[in-house]
Amino acid sequence: MAYYWDMPEATAKAFRNGWLHTGDIGVMDEDGFFYIVDRKNDMLISGGYNVYPREVEDVLKEFPGVAEVAVVGLPDEKWGDRVVAVVAGSGELDSDAIMEFAKGRLSGVKRPKQILVWPELPKSGANKILRRSVRDTLVNEKRTA
């Protein structure tokens, strides 16, 4: 890839010193294989700490009945981003029980301040959860509330 079509600012931001900066966060295993684990652009900053949504989502998915999770940051005057989780799954999901479950597994800054239960999460054509759509819905709900 040489550039973004008709997007000179995005091209300048992504290409620096001949390298393409994708915004992906990866890890290398002991055999030298790389795995993409998150996106830097999805990272939240809450109280000055980096919070990776994927890390929080992985913990919340361990709760019985939770099939899907989207963790987003909502604007907060004090913390910068307020960590909010939206879950979907089977049966009756209790947000208080999920919150209690998270207390033993996540540090305070990473623990969601609010957990919402939705019937399903918005997805792309490739069946990926659309965090941005979740965030936009929550921000718009707050504006109209």
Label every model-predicted segment.
Residues A2-D6, A10-K13, I25-K110, P119-E120, ...:
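AMP-binding/adenylate-forming catalytic core of the ANL superfamily
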